[in-house]
């Protein structure tokens, strides 16, 4: 397998991994520590992820418990969660922060499904852009005499197969997440 095809698959896999991370951050009405993935706290002047400042537990299906290692950071963590606009209200007793994840309404579920589809579509566009870039590079290589016309055709077919597989994987990830969101 040529380096170009390996590069193509590697770049496409990165797009799929990015999609997986984005989908993991979308709450399906159940408490999940991934909900706090993008939340950073201003801790002694440095933006720090919540995961580095506290242990995060999920004792019940709709409850997140955040136990800061440094009790003086409770208020800062709480402010950061509120500022992150996650659609949840943290409550604190001075030692731990509890986040009760509300049940999703039918309307909110539909909004989330739309968001998931949009994120999936963006990932597909990313995959297609990778395909276009690689195909342009292959045509340039053929024009410069670096590869033969047969190699061009063969590698273009390989790029298309990689694209098709990646799009199929994206569709599956999106369908699984939609099913997860719509299940009550």
Swiss-Prot record:
Keyword Transmembrane helix in annotation: no
Cellular component aspect of the GO annotation: cytoplasm
Localization of this protein: Cytoplasm
Biological process annotations from GO: translational termination
CDD domains hit by this protein: RRF
SUPFAM superfamilies: Ribosome recycling factor, RRF
Example GO molecular function: ribosomal large subunit binding
UniProt region (Disordered), positions on chain: 141-165
UniProt cross-references to Gene3D superfamilies, sorted A to Z: 3.30.1360.40, Ribosome-recycling factor
InterPro entries noted in UniProt: Ribosome_recyc_fac (IPR002661), Ribosome_recyc_fac_dom (IPR023584), RRF_sf (IPR036191)
Keywords recorded for this protein, A-Z: Cytoplasm, Protein biosynthesis
Family the entry assigns: Belongs to the RRF family.
Function of the molecule: Responsible for the release of ribosomes from messenger RNA at the termination of protein biosynthesis. May increase the efficiency of translation by recycling ribosomes from one round of translation to another.
Protein name per UniProt: Ribosome-recycling factor
Organism, as annotated: Staphylococcus epidermidis (strain ATCC 35984 / DSM 28319 / BCRC 17069 / CCUG 31568 / BM 3577 / RP62A)
Gene: frr
